[in-house]
Each structure stands twice: as structure tokens, then as C-alpha cells.
Curated annotation (Swiss-Prot):
Positions annotated to bind NAD(+): 71-76, 105-109, 129-130, 142, 151, 169-172
Cofactor binding summary note: Binds 1 divalent metal cation per subunit. Can use either Co(2+) or Zn(2+).
Function of the molecule: Catalyzes the conversion of 3-deoxy-D-arabino-heptulosonate 7-phosphate (DAHP) to dehydroquinate (DHQ).
NCBIfam families, per the entry: aroB
Cofactor needs: Co(2+); Zn(2+); NAD(+)
Gene that this polypeptide is encoded by: aroB
E.C. code: 4.2.3.4
InterPro entries: Dehydroquinate_synthase (IPR050071), DHQ_synth_AroB (IPR016037), DHQ_synth_fam (IPR030963), DHQS/DOIS_N (IPR030960), DHQS_C (IPR056179)
Family assignment from sequence similarity: Belongs to the sugar phosphate cyclases superfamily. Dehydroquinate synthase family.
Protein known as: 3-dehydroquinate synthase
Length: 362
């Protein structure tokens, strides 16, 4: 069992990583006997895990209600968020309730925002079931829903009480979702840890076949890196922005193509190549290092080009609504070397458009 602490003073919390955690009531601390829980999951995961998690919580004396949401990025919306509020109020659940997010990034982000908003804030626990949510979205307290004009535009910073990562969930993950998660894994190597990127080049095949020790190390290292960044910059005023490598471009793809048509990790993968090409055009990143990124992403089964039907010009309106924009100016996350990156302002739109065009499918 691996245990990592996100250090945020009184709001510090543990990330527990192991197989078989859904069989252990202690996995869901700080829940105690007699407490009330609203378990939030989706229609795909409910048949797989809802009864198991409900059973282990009830075994610990916890009173469990549940709400099952539709599955898909297109349902990460204010309308679906309202169904969670309605379920909470119908019971009713008070300020002493705990929301448990059992699912991937959509369930986790939406449930976290519900917890931040319901009666001005109730406790919640992240139980991520996808690789992407285990290594990234469940850690750090970013909660949100989408708006038709932009991804994650309505939300709050709100930290969970704990994160429970059961590696056994990956056994039911579709290959496309596994690849999507690997995009965020590869991101950590590019922005923060060149040695980890080297390790990924050597061990990617093991991750693709869900090798237990390799996957446990991979998730642990990603969570360590994210925990360090969040502890240093919880509200993304500086260092934490680096975690958005590829996201400014990627969010544009997701919004323009319709939420759910490109998985988040797929869009981020293409976006990371666009960021690398931008950095190349600025003369601060080598084409050889861009090729290393492209090769690793392709091996993971990820796209390295934007959608054929999306012109370079179509990216700009979305990118100018990005949450990192200050005073109307884009701030891009750009690699300087494998393992080192920067936040860069003042890049001309023409250069960015040319970098996007470099990455468009033929």
C-alpha cells in the first residue's frame, strides 16, 4: 500500500494507493459509523462497483444513499449537477453529510463542485476509477462543470478529505480510456521529471498490459509530483499552471468538437504536441525532443494531430477564453526540455496558428 499526503495545513489529506481497497472499510476514512453519505457514480460504473462500495461502507456503520448519473463528458453540466442537489435535498442531507465521488474525472469534478456548493460546503471523498482521474483530476481540489462556451468554466477550488485509489478498477477500463489517462501520465514527465519520462519510455508496454508493480509506481509518482505542486501553489497563481501543458489547445478541441467526441486525454495529447511545436518555433525546444514526445504518445495509442475538420483559426476563440488568460493575453505552458517547462505570455497569434497548422492531420 502506498500513502501520499497532500500537505495543505489543516486541509491536508491522504492519497491511498493499493489493490483491494474496496474490500476494506478503513479505506474510506475519515468516515465513521453513524455518518451519512451520498454516493455519486454513473450508469456505467454502478453495475461494477456501487454495491461493493455501498456494502463496505454499510459494514462500517455508514448510512448510504446514492445517485446515478448518465455517463459522458457531455453530462458534466449544470443540469446534471442540479440532479445531485435534488437528490441531496429530497432525503434531506444536512451539512454533516459526505459526498463520495465514485468514478472518473466527470464524476469527480462534478461531485466535488456539488460538495463545494451544497449548503456552502460539505465534506467529500474522491474514489477515482480511471487512470486519468487517479493520476490527475482527483488530486488537488479543482472541481467544475462545463459550459457550452468552455470546459471547466464554472467551478471552485475545494479539496477532498481523502483520495482512495483502488488499482483493481483499471481492470475494467476500456483501452481508449487507459490511453487517455496515459496522456496525463506522460505530461508529468514532460513538465517536471525527465527521469520519469525516461522510465515511461522503458516501461510503457508494461503499463499498457496493466502490470501491477509498474502501474503502482506510475500512479504513485504522478500523485507525488502533483501533491508537491498543489502544496506549493494550491490556487494556480504560478507553478501549478504548468500542470496545464497541452490543455489550452486541448480544451479548444473538446469544446469545438463537442464534449465527449474527443476524450480529454486525447485532446491533451494533441495539445502537448502543439505546445512543443510552439516552443520549437520560439527556438527554445528541439525537434528531436518533440519527436520523443510524439513517439511515446503514439505508442500509447494517442493522437498527435488535431482534428482534420478543425481549422487552426477555430482554436483561437476558445484559447482566448482559457482560464489562464490575463488582460486578454494568452498564457501558454511550453516545454523547454524534457522535464522542464514554463508559463509564457506574449506569443503572437500568428506563431501559435502556425504551430497548430504543423500538427493538423493531412
Amino acid at each position: 500500500m502506498e500513502r501520499i499526503v497532500v500537505t495543505l495545513g489543516e486541509r491536508s489529506y491522504p492519497i491511498t494507493i493499493a489493490s483491494g481497497l474496496f474490500n476494506e472499510p478503513a479505506s474510506f476514512l475519515p468516515l465513521k459509523s453513524g455518518e451519512q453519505v451520498m454516493l455519486v457514480t454513473n450508469e456505467t460504473l454502478a453495475p461494477l462497483y456501487l454495491d461493493k462500495v455501498r456494502g463496505v461502507l454499510e459494514q462500517a456503520g455508514v448510512n448510504v444513499d446514492s445517485v446515478i448519473l448518465p455517463d459522458g463528458e457531455q453530462y458534466k453540466s449544470l443540469a446534471v449537477l442540479d440532479t445531485v442537489f435534488t437528490a441531496l435535498l429530497q432525503k434531506p442531507h444536512g451539512r454533516d453529510t459526505t459526498l463520495v465521488a465514485l468514478g472518473g474525472g466527470v464524476v469527480g469534478d462534478l461531485t466535488g463542485f456539488a460538495a463545494a456548493s451544497y449548503q456552502r460546503g460539505v465534506r467529500f471523498i474522491q474514489v477515482p476509477t480511471t487512470l486519468l482521474s487517479q493520476v490527475d483530476s482527483s488530486v488537488g481540489g479543482k472541481t467544475a462543470v462545463n459550459h457550452p462556451l468552455g470546459k471547466n468554466m464554472i467551478g471552485a477550488f475545494y479539496q477532498p478529505a481523502s483520495v482512495v485509489v483502488d488499482l483493481d478498477c483499471l481492470k475494467t477500463l476500456p483501452p481508449r480510456e487507459l490511453a487517455s489517462g496515459l496522456a496525463e501520465v506522460i505530461k508529468y514527465g514532460i513538465i517536471l521529471d525527465g527521469a520519469f519520462f525516461n522510465w515511461l519510455e522503458e516501461h510503457l508496454d508494461a503499463l499498457l498490459r496493466l502490470d501491477g508493480p509498474a502501474m503502482a509506481y506510475c500512479i504513485r509518482r504522478c500523485c507525488e509530483l502533483k501533491a508537491e505542486v498543489v502544496a506549493a501553489d494550491e490556487r494556480e497563481t504560478g507553478l501549478r499552471a504548468l500542470l496545464n501543458l497541452g490543455h489550452t489547445f486541448g480544451h479548444a478541441i473538446e469544446a469545438e468538437m463537442g464534449y465527449g467526441n474527443w476524450l480529454h486525454g486525447e485532446a491533451v495529447a494533441a495539445g502537448m504536441v502543439m505546445a512543443a511545436r510552439t516552443s520549437e518555433r520560439l527556438g527554445q525546444f528541439s525537434s528531436a525532443e518533440t519527436q520523443r514526445i510524439i513517439t511515446l504518445l503514439k505508442r500509447a495509442g494517442l493522437p498527435v494531430n488535431g482534428p482534420r475538420e478543425m481549422s487552426a483559426q477555430a482554436y483561437l476563440p476558445h484559447m482566448l477564453r482559457d482560464k489562464k488568460v490575463l488582460a486578454g493575453e494568452m498564457r501558454l505552458i511550453l516545454p523547454l526540455a524534457i522535464g522542464k517547462s514554463e508559463v509564457r505570455s506574449g506569443v503572437s497569434h500568428e506563431l501559435v496558428l502556425n504551430a497548430i497548422a504543423d500538427c493538423q492531420s493531412a
